[in-house]
Amino acid sequence: MACFNPNNTIFTQSSPRFKQMFMYMAGYEDEVRFDREVASGMTVRGYLGKVKCPTLLVTGEFDPLCPLEDAVEAFHDLKVPKEMWVIENQSHPLWGLANLGGLDCHDYVMDWLKGLFSGQRLPTKRGRIAYVREQGDGPWGKSDWTPPIRPGQAYF
């Protein structure tokens, strides 16, 4: 899992400490140089339309590193069969979730891939968005959802 990040919010709106740590790991001390040489290119904008395989996006409803509006924009930019799961009341870490029976989202992603590769569960080109509630029945239950925002609109 990673950030969809079409708007580079991971460095512009998240905690400044996150950017400082990323700069340290990338070997940069100069923030202007880091923005120009690294951060400016860390986006999926302009690339999602080139994806050729079915795609699953999973995001926490209140993820500070990849806000819901960024995930919605990325979802709309995909032109392939697609699905997105929005995990109610969660942020970036998606493990040990009540929404998923105490399991990590990775377990469910593997099930999604198994269904895809076996031909048993194929997403549609139009796409499906599931709102995975804390007390719900998971991403394959009655969870179809239309986000109350469009790309570019703030969720909260």
Regions found by a protein language model. Give the residues of each.
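Hydrolase active-site cap/lid region
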Residues: 1-37
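Short beta-strand/loop motif that positions the catalytic acidic residue
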Residues: 51-52, 57-59, 63
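Flexible loop/turn segments at secondary-structure boundaries
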Residues: 3-10, 64-66, 91-95, 135
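Catalytic active-site module of serine/aspartate enzymes centered on a nucleophile-bearing elbow/loop
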Residues: 98-156
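Short alpha-helix in the alpha/beta-hydrolase fold that links the catalytic acid
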Residues: 53, 67-76
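Active-site nucleophile elbow and catalytic-triad environment of alpha/beta-hydrolase enzymes
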Residues: 29-47, 53
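Conserved adenylate-forming
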Residues: 11-14, 46-50
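Catalytic histidine neighborhood in serine/cysteine hydrolases
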Residues: 75-94, 108
